[in-house]
Amino acid sequence: MYLYTLILLFLASVNVNAYADPGACSGNCWTHDPGLYQRKSDGKYFRFATGGGIHIASADSLEGPWTDDGYVLPNGSIIDLNGKNNLWAPDLHYRDGTYYLYYAVSSLGSQNSAIGVATSKTMEAGSWTDHGTTGIESTPASPYNAIDANWIAVGGTQYANFGSYWNNLFQVEMTNGLKVKSGATPHQIAYNASGIHRQEAAFMFERNDYFYLTFSGGIALGYNDTWPAPGEEYFISVCRSTSATGGFVDKNGVSCLNSGGTLLLASHGFVYGPGGQGILKDSSKGFVLYYHYADTRIGKAVEDYQFGWNQLKWENDWPSV
């Protein structure tokens, strides 16, 4: 009986400690669907978040202290859709001396959506120019929802990954960081066939000979009203491919187009519902997974969400936390 108890305690400790706790954060640590980038000129960190005209926070260290710097577009987007004053899901990239920030204009449960773009030379508040829609748009007649954009360049070709619920994740070729390539048609890159297809927040990155597609699944919010059934809250998964445009499979070889996905990060300890993730290639820490989560010691409302980050570990070219 004593041995059996020890075994149970050991298994419980393994489960609790399956993931590393988030890295340290001080100052303004609130975030929601974060976008994170390190400025090329001085290494300063800028963190962007869903809400209003896209929240801006900055710090000299990933650990903080983070300060609240205002908004990217304090007057909202020039895209004339419901939600233009409450922008979502920022995604950052840098190209030829300019920082690009993708954002989504939509409202909960709607497919009347568009992905917009703003540019800056510094990422500072007050420096951003809104260019409006990228041409990635959706209506109830579309097979996808045009939110949650993520940019990647492969050689000289640029792509935007996007999508949420409905038929999940899609990709389309871009002419540049501002507009979809004329005549380009989005194609599906991942799909969760179960239930109401809870999959969103694509983020793709390249390492060694692989392209990695991370995404969020599960229930993203509403935790202050009721806790989802265990395992149904937000979580982060990953697939990989030797091509950026398709063929993504999980660690077991299951296609991401057939509900595949290897769990990268899920609830553990005080961390509940991690998601809305991205990957930063940090100048000193290497590949860093960043995300928001509900800290059960603080609160479970969106207003209580916290900034989480972890350095990725690698085994056989698969990441873990």
Curated annotation (Swiss-Prot):
UniProt superkingdom: Eukaryota
A GO molecular-function descriptor: arabinan endo-1,5-alpha-L-arabinosidase activity
Keywords, ordered alphabetically: Carbohydrate metabolism, Glycoprotein, Glycosidase, Hydrolase, Polysaccharide degradation, Secreted, Signal, Xylan degradation
Record-level GO cellular component terms: extracellular region
Gene3D superfamilies, alphabetized: Glycosyl hydrolase domain, family 43
Glycosylation-annotated residues: N75, N192, N224
Pfam families for this protein: Glyco_hydro_43 (PF04616)
InterPro entries (UniProt xref): GH43_arabinanases, Glyco_hydro_43, Glyco_hydro_43_endo_a_Ara-ase, Glyco_hydro_beta-prop_sf
The keyword Ligase belongs to this UniProt entry's keyword annotation: no
Signal peptide: 1-20
Catalytic activity: Endohydrolysis of (1->5)-alpha-arabinofuranosidic linkages in (1->5)-arabinans
Entry EC no(s): 3.2.1.99
Keyword check for Hydrolase: yes
Protein's job: Endo-1,5-alpha-L-arabinanase involved in degradation of pectin. Its preferred substrate is linear 1,5-alpha-L-arabinan.
Membership in a protein family: Belongs to the glycosyl hydrolase 43 family.
Protein name in UniProt: Probable arabinan endo-1,5-alpha-L-arabinosidase C
Species of provenance: Neosartorya fischeri (strain ATCC 1020 / DSM 3700 / CBS 544.65 / FGSC A1164 / JCM 1740 / NRRL 181 / WB 181) (Aspergillus fischerianus)
Highest classification ranks of the organism: Eukaryota, Fungi, Dikarya, Ascomycota, Pezizomycotina
Recorded name of the encoding gene: abnC
